[in-house]
Amino acid sequence: MWGGRFSAKPAELMQAINVSIGFDKRLWAQDLAGSRAHARMLMNQGVIASHDGEEILEGLARVEDELLSGTFPFRDEYEDIHMNIEARLRELIGPTAGRLHTARSRNDQVAVDFRLWVRDACDRTVGQLEALQKALLTQAEAHAESLMPGFTHLQPAQPVTFGHHLMAYVEMFGRDAGRFRDARARMNECPLGAAALAGSPFPIDRQQTASALGFDRPTANSLDSVSSRDFALEALSAASITATHLSRLAEEIVLWTTPMFGFIKLTDAFTTGSSIMPQKKNPDAAELIRAKVGRILGSLTTLTVVMKGLPLAYSKDMQEDKVPTFEAFDALELSLLAMAGMIADLTPNTENMAKAAGAGFSTATDLADWLVRTLNMPFRDAHHVTGSAVKTAEGLGVDLADLSLAQFQAIEPQITKEVYAVLTPAASAASRMSYGGTAPAQVRAQIARWKELLA
């Protein structure tokens, strides 16, 4: 491919560090798509003869058959997927294969291949996120009224419903899907035709190849086209945020399955045992999802560091863009699929959840709110009175609802027996009727909205 300039073969170590076919073979479908679009454009523009173009297209179809059947002969001496396919095309149809590279460089070829792959990965990820959201919606709808403690600092804070808690993740994953859609929209420009860096002297039609490959338009600057990998960085950023959300949900699943919490139960399908402790049933799927964020965020860091000091245009450093991107999306796909399966698999222990919902004086804020509404007390004063009530109850070893009216009135004489109506977890949750709140009616409204969005 470039032997005319060289009189000796590269050293074995040079070949070893330079070859990329071991990982970029994953781009074969994208490479074929780009080559077909390029060949048809060259024919239409009269850059190559129609009979040559048709021979090339027929040869590419034969190459595709070999790739699909697993009989394609990948060879390290051809370095990468582009030259492997071109070399095989030459073996199948002869020297006409050499016309395919007219008005094209490997620089714009790999740019379009990789952009197509990342675009497809974004589309797949959106579908996987939506499947996870639907699994969460199913559980949330079944448990729109199931009480559980809401936490701050992992301490009981206020009663919420299990459905409301799960809907928080539906929102997070919805934003994640939006980030992938946004990244896709920005990357949907075709770099093919930029050639090495300066464009092509041939009368090519870049809009034709862009349209053929499903892009909105060609990239506007040939130098930027082959120099940039920000489309992959943006996709990896979205992947890292998604993995962070998955890790948080996984951590809660790990906590909730412990005997100390006892909020949910996982079946054998998503747990493993111990080689020494017969009683163990470990939430390994959740733990592994929790850990995957390290690999995914590491991939973003890797590619950022690769790109940070590169002058324009292409440098061989950019060959290192693919492995971290492939690994990140492989890990993310597995995590999303496993999480969706685990969410569908889990069974909440609503009795334990409801019992825990009232722990830690979780209705204290409801008492303070009652003092504000009923006695027209400034909230800071109500906060102080409620704190005194909590201190009294704690000293007696009882809950707020177990204090007698006399004990309440010893703290604040204006308190009446009506206060007891707000001191149950169910009443607390039901009262949170503000938009987006945990009241079952609000939770059902959130569920209905997302069902419509995901329909």
From Swiss-Prot:
Could you say which EC number(s) this protein's record lists? Answer: 4.3.2.1
Tell me yes or no: is Lipoprotein among this UniProt entry's keywords.
Answer: no
Q: InterPro entries per the record? A: Arg_succ_lyase_C, Argininosuccinate_lyase, Fumarase/histidase_N, Fumarate_lyase_CS, Fumarate_lyase_fam, Fumarate_lyase_N, L-Aspartase-like
Q: Which reaction does it catalyse?
A: 2-(N(omega)-L-arginino)succinate = fumarate + L-arginine
- Provide the Gene Ontology terms for cellular component: cytosol
UniProt entry keywords in alphabetical sequence: Amino-acid biosynthesis, Arginine biosynthesis, Cytoplasm, Lyase
Location in the cell = Cytoplasm
Pfam family name, one: Lyase_1
Instruction: Give the PROSITE patterns listed for this entry.
Output: FUMARATE_LYASES
Q: What does the entry give for GO biological process? A: arginine biosynthetic process via ornithine; L-arginine biosynthetic process
> Pathway, per UniProt?
Amino-acid biosynthesis; L-arginine biosynthesis; L-arginine from L-ornithine and carbamoyl phosphate: step 3/3
Q: Name one GO molecular function term.
A: argininosuccinate lyase activity
Q: Name the principal localization, coarsely classed.
A: cytoplasm
Similarity field: Belongs to the lyase 1 family. Argininosuccinate lyase subfamily.
**Name this polypeptide is given:** Argininosuccinate lyase
| Taxonomic source organism | Caulobacter vibrioides (strain ATCC 19089 / CIP 103742 / CB 15)
Q: What is the lineage of its organism?
A: Bacteria, Pseudomonadati, Pseudomonadota, Alphaproteobacteria, Caulobacterales
